Amino acid sequence: MQEWKEKIRIVRGRLAWASLPLCFCGLVLFDAALRFFYRAAGSTRFLDWRAFVFTGAWSLLLTGVAALLPPLGRRIAMGVYAVFFGLLSVVHGVMFNIFGEFFTFSDTNFAGDGAKFFSLSYLNLRKALVASIVLAMLLLAVGAWLVPKRQPGKPRWPRLAGASGAILLSLVSVVLLNRSLLPQADTMTWGSLFDPNSEEQAYKDFTDSNRCLLMTGLYQYTARDFVVSFGLEASPVDLNSLDQFYEERAGQVSGENEYTGLYEGKSLLMVMLESIDTWLLTPEYMPNLYALQQQGTNFVHNYTPLFLSAGTFNTEFISQTGLLPSVTGLSSSIYSTNSFPFSLAHQFSQQGYTVGSFHTASAGIYSRGSIHQNLGMTYHSGAEMGMDDYMLDSQMMEGYDMFIPEGPFFSYIITYSGHGPYTEEMGNISAPHWEAAQAAVAQSGVESTPANLEEYTHAVAHAMETDQFIGELVAQLEADGRLEDTVLLFYTDHYGKYLTDKEFLYQLKGVSADSPELYRTPCFFYAKGQQPQTVEKYVAPVDLAPTIVNLFGLDTDTRYYMGDDMFGDQGGVVLFPDGGWYDGETYYTSDYQGEVTQEMRDTSAMARRREEASFNTLRADYFARREIS
């Protein structure tokens, strides 16, 4: 045994020179593996020189920092690199699998709440990627093991000088390349065209995580994302520019139309459906909801873009305020502290309506208790409604008298049972409907692997639970004579993103990964006695607030909404993050390669200006500072 230890010591001593090169190679491998296996996530080539320069410079910098440390510190540094960047690579992969976008530090605003819904099924990473991450960690581990002990008498200045030179070279490279990618100060204007081919604009905004990671590599992406996400380089908001925007906006909103005041005096039951995608809303799976859709005013071109990775809160906030949340640079606390005088709850409350919000989860999830209070409505959890199992939407009927009070009311309900994962982890949702779901799926003609079909069956069973609640709710409204004076609005928070196999999801929706149709979701009003109607206009949740205030005849200044009345003569363009948009013909994003017309330039200027105005309104707490109410 002693002989083997001596041999290992000798080998370790002879290979000590390889410690720092192994550290460098391990760091490079983390980036190369992530970008190679997700190279289809954007239009940037894997061999793009900027990513390799950034990665080489950052890897050299981190290796140089380790080299400056004493042996124990060097080993610790390499261990930290291995664990941190290994986990970060896994997080990027998981986030991309779920949301189709890489991780950004802005996601940490809601990370604690999102973690409560985490499932091991989301760790479905490619084996080759996992192997590459493990190999990179092993390279760093071996590099740490090979770090030589202190050698008294041996001069340290060559190592320190070399490390300092490497750090200096790395910093110069990163700074120069960073500056070259940023646009000149006089080339960017608030209303300028979103040029999908402008690398400078994408790098400045740094909101397109896929494009930016592929363009800059793992390490520069991490550093710049941290700076942008936490607003460390944000300049003060120019309130005068916002004043000008809203003055111009006053002349752009739709005026009164044939739908103005159509529902005046009626109550509104606004129901946001958790994960009820188009492929679930069928007569076989959700007969109650489907019947209401066919009898109501159906918006067949409704889309729910995700400005935040917290998809439910994303659509919740947008639909209640008519504002678009900032992708980066804002603390989640602004939703609880900013002034939102034009929220739907405040507008209905001013008309004497009883207002409230209802969801099965606790008030702490996404800080709904404080946020909803700030928006003007009291939040009621499943426990307050008397539910035994918060996962079962049908048990929300225990709180019926709370969300259907006497007199006119505005009640906001968020369902839960459609939530993923679609596995046995939430088997208590599936169980009451499992046999019915199996029978319906067997008749559907949907074909895939056994694993996919099992998930699909769970998803159908989850939807059936939500449909049971809707059926019981409408029946009780009818029995109580309240259906005649109550308008129901149903819309979905986000597409059905919880299926593990995304190709199977695309098959179900009949779309490709980069199609805007992936984001098309149900949205319709139902009012008893009203003739069925199909609306072809292209709309989104940001259009709900101005539509509702017009339908209910509320005296609201709609210039302060970023959307447009769904029945008005304005709008018809769906705003996507990063300045993108879709009007049914053109999907204008960073991947757009066609001819750019003047009309498209005008639409891009509008989309970009509205998004930035909304972000700056939130950043500055504009309504409070201008005392607008």
Locate each region found by the language model.
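Transmembrane and membrane-interface helices of multi-pass
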Residues: Q2-L218
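Short, charge-rich amphipathic segments
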Residues: G13-L27, L34, Y38-F46, A66-A67, ...
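A diffuse structural propensity rather than consistent per-protein peaks
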Residues: V94-D107, R126-K127, G231, S235-D238, ...
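Hydrophobic residues in alpha-helical segments
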Residues: N97, F118, T207, T222, ...
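Feature for exported/extracytoplasmic and membrane-associated proteins, marking the mature portion
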Residues: L129, P158-S164, L171-P236, L344-G369, ...
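Extended low-complexity intrinsically disordered regions
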Residues: Y221-E258
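Solvent-exposed soluble domains appended to multi-pass membrane proteins
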Residues: Q244-S629
